[in-house]
């Protein structure tokens, strides 16, 4: 059984202290045993190895590896990968995240074409592009996102593009640049309920993130919007329901809810493992509140089954519009 996978242990890249900003923090409690419902297959298939080879050959970074995603074996076996642009070093230090923190390197201006070439070689029908936070850049990396989307459109015109962005806090005009590139899905994760932001996501602002998602719809109503949260961080059910209402007020289409898994003893503790029946209850409630699509399971992650979910999103929108069109 594998839960949080250390796929970086054989990484040929130079070793750096992964979380220097967390070194001074007291150790957090670590759950000795994970419940039976959190089980994943360890990676190692031929398709997984081929996907890894293409990623390595192009010198690319994937959030699948950097964040220790438990679904990497399943996704890479299907040749699904979430590419992380603008380097592997984040300017923020969220208490839940396994991505390293520090001063990032300069942007690789050839990266958009490298990503696009990999997408074409993997034959991806749907690709997810995410990034570290780049508060050091004037536009937060918005133009780099736009160039990456454009490069994928040129190299693989049939591929739909989903982006998972940072919040572009205090980066005027950045969001407009990204939306103008016309991704098919715009995802920005709230991550947790507002009461937990100071301890879980201290560099962000909850209502700024909600407004970011709302603004995407105002700029281009055709773009699907999506957001995700983790549970098991000490949130209350009523707080999660209020978060759903906040997202619906921003006209967000798709909500993902998954179990938080602790990357190390220096990260936020797992307050509890939420049982599958509670995830099902969240899913039922979210659909009742009007989301087009909801994915709520212990192993749900933002990019998990993203291609299949995009097809389901399209079908859900069409079903919603059909009665109005026939009236």
Curated annotation (Swiss-Prot):
Its EC number is 2.8.1.8. It catalyses: [[Fe-S] cluster scaffold protein carrying a second [4Fe-4S](2+) cluster] + N(6)-octanoyl-L-lysyl-[protein] + 2 oxidized [2Fe-2S]-[ferredoxin] + 2 S-adenosyl-L-methionine + 4 H(+) = [[Fe-S] cluster scaffold protein] + N(6)-[(R)-dihydrolipoyl]-L-lysyl-[protein] + 4 Fe(3+) + 2 hydrogen sulfide + 2 5'-deoxyadenosine + 2 L-methionine + 2 reduced [2Fe-2S]-[ferredoxin]. It comes from the Bacteria. [4Fe-4S] cluster 2 binds at residues 90, 94, 97. Pathway: Protein modification; protein lipoylation via endogenous pathway; protein N(6)-(lipoyl)lysine from octanoyl-[acyl-carrier-protein]: step 2/2. Residues 76-292 form the Radical SAM core domain. It is found in: Cytoplasm. Its cofactor is [4Fe-4S] cluster. Residues 8-32 have a biased composition (Basic and acidic residues). It is an enzyme of class 2 (transferase). Residues 1-32 are annotated as: Disordered. Keywords: 4Fe-4S, Cytoplasm, Iron, Iron-sulfur, Metal-binding, S-adenosyl-L-methionine, Transferase. The keyword 4Fe-4S applies. One of its GO terms (cellular component) is cytoplasm. GO terms for molecular function: 4 iron, 4 sulfur cluster binding; lipoate synthase activity; metal ion binding. SMART domains: Elp3 (SM00729). Binds 2 [4Fe-4S] clusters per subunit. One cluster is coordinated with 3 cysteines and an exchangeable S-adenosyl-L-methionine. [4Fe-4S] cluster 1 binds at residues 64, 69, 75, 303. Belongs to the radical SAM superfamily. Lipoyl synthase family. PANTHER family: LIPOYL SYNTHASE, LIPOYL SYNTHASE, MITOCHONDRIAL. This is Lipoyl synthase. It comes from Methylobacterium radiotolerans (strain ATCC 27329 / DSM 1819 / JCM 2831 / NBRC 15690 / NCIMB 10815 / 0-1).
